[in-house]
UniProtKB/Swiss-Prot annotation:
It comes from Penaeus schmitti. GO terms for molecular function: neuropeptide hormone activity. This is Crustacean hyperglycemic hormone. It is found in: Secreted. GO terms for biological process: circadian rhythm; glucose metabolic process; neuropeptide signaling pathway. It comes from the Eukaryota.
């Protein structure tokens, strides 16, 4: 996974990998090139990431992912 310089929190390779994989999966579903880049923008703190999260991840895990975003 590429390291996003906009992430200024904890550098946790595993967490960043999970967030990045969500963006990859989202891109694979929607096949829109901008999805992959926008999902990662602002260190995953953006509306595209939230849409991907809601579409791909069970609702009971949303808070966990949101906490990851705030960590990195």
């Amino acid at each position: 996974a590429n390291f996003d310089p906009s992430c200024t929190g904890v550098y946790d390779r595993e967490l960043l990998g999970r967030l990045s994989r969500l963006c990859d999966d989202c891109y694979n579903v929607f096949r829109e090139p901008k999805v992959a880049t926008e999902c990662r923008s602002n260190c995953f703190y953006n509306p595209v990431f939230v849409q991907c999260l809601e579409y791909l991840i069970p609702a009971d895990l949303h808070e966990e992912y949101q906490a990851h975003v705030q960590t990195v």
